[in-house]
Amino acid sequence: CAQCHHHPFEKWSQKDYYQLSAFFSQVGRAKGRLPDEDIIYHKRGVAKATNKKDNTPVQPAGLGAESPVIASDDDPRQALVDWMSAKDNPFFAHTFVNRYWKHFFGRGLVDPEDDMRETNPAVNPELLQALAEKFIESGFDMKGIVRDLCRSKTYQFSSIPNRYNAKDKHNFSRHYPQRLQAEVLLDSIDDLTEVRTGFSGLPAGTRATMLPDNSFNQKSYFLSVFGRPDNASAC
């Protein structure tokens, strides 16, 4: 939304959009030796973008953050990564632990999990904040957050509802049944039937959960029907 106009429901402006896009202004692309080979490289120079609303130049900056000092020889994407993983960044840790929560509990504390905004608050903001703070303090220990979630009392809840939580659909008073991912379901069927699904170009015995990318979706009717995402877009 903020590319063409100020965001209608959030605080982000077009300037915020172009400041974020400026981190990628020095990314170059060239053809490789092979027909379908692209080479992505860093172009030297000052990273900047043009705010198309008023045609003013803007420097790279994270959302709600000051512009970092980036030398002309430095890759501005490194500065973006530094901002994303900074302990005072209010976005990365919250988004990360929310996605892990969605993976294990079937629904994020913020739902949908890719719609993190002030006008779509978490059902338990204190819990999300506590998980994010612990994730940061641990040095972004992914195994640690998995261990905490899987050892929690909430994760141990039965999926069989009782008269107190039968109507609950978002407070996590019970475990919500969720559909298996397409890859997991295919591997489970292979195990039960003792018949292995083969994938052209990969070694025999390769399981669906081991596929290196999504190009195999078109070669597997099962994965296509049962919803393995193509990752063709970010939305």
Regions flagged by a language model, labelled:
Residues 214, 218-226:
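Active-site Gly/Thr loop motif
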Residues 1-203, 220, 229-234:
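Primarily short, surface-exposed interaction patches in extracytoplasmic proteins
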